[in-house]
Structures are given as structure tokens and as C-alpha cells.
Amino acid sequence: NFLQILIITKLANGEVLAPKHKDHPLSGDWVGHRECHIQPDWLLVYRYDNDVLVLALSRTGTHSDLFGL
């Protein structure tokens, strides 16, 4: 998907995502990960390793797919 690749490219380049993507840190079992919205109910969970441009993509899916909500 073009939009997913665009967002991953921005994250890999250290760019800040537009506010519509609601990029934010996660808590609980997901501490150390971040989540952004590719589309309103299509999420990307990711994390950076040691503040370097190593992007570890964790999961993508809807809120229900990822968190059972």
C-alpha cells in the first residue's frame, strides 16, 4: 500500500508525521513502542532501537486486530 510505504519512509528518515496520523507512545505491554494511524482504523505499531535510524516494525492492523478492542 502506497500510504503505508510513505509513512514507513518518513519514520525511517526521522520525519515528524502529520497530526492526522496521531503518532503517540504506547503503554502497558507495549511500552517502548509507538503507534500511528495510516488510516482511521488502520494502525502501525513500531519502535526505534537506541535512537538510531533502525526502525523495527512490529504490527499493522485495526484496533481490534492489535489490541482486541
Residue locations for each model-derived region?
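Basic, Lys/Arg-enriched alpha-helical interface segments
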Residues: 1-40, 49-55, 63-69
